[in-house]
C-alpha cells in the first residue's frame, strides 16, 4: 500500500505527498506580502497529533514569526470536516467577531470554496476586504468567482513516485525482506489567482 497526499498517522505504509510545513509557510508569506496581518487558519490545529492540519498550522506560524507578526491562537479555527459547509461555517463565525481577519488560509480547497460563498453572502469583497488561499488545486478552484489562489501539489510526480514505490514492493515481495517504510515529498507551487489579486 502507498498512501497519496495526506497521511492520517504513522501506519507502516509508504507515503507520497508534499512538504506541508513549507507549503503553508509559502502561502502565508504570500498573504503577508499583500499586507495582510490578521490571517486566520480555517481547519488549523495548534496542539495535538502531527497530522496535515498541524503541519500546515506550523508552517503558518513559522511565516508569522519570520515576519514579526504575533501569533493569535484565536485565529486558528478547527473544523469538524474538510467540506464546503465547514469552510462556510468557519468564515461566517470569523466575520461575526469584533476583530475580523483580513485573510483566510484554508487548509484545503473545499474549505476555501465554502468560505468564499459565506463571504459573498455577507457582502465581503474578495480580494478587497479579505484574501483567501486554499490547498490542493482542485478543478473547482479555477472556476470559482473569484478564482481561488491555492497550493498545487505536483500530482504527476506524486503518481509517478507512488507507482514506483508500489512496483518495488510488489517485485520485492518474493525476493527477501521488504525495504523499510518510505516517506517521499514531491514539489508544489503556489498558483496565484483572483482571490489574492492575481
Predicted regions and their residues:
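Bacterial carbohydrate/catabolite-sensing allosteric modules
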Residues: 1-3, 7-198
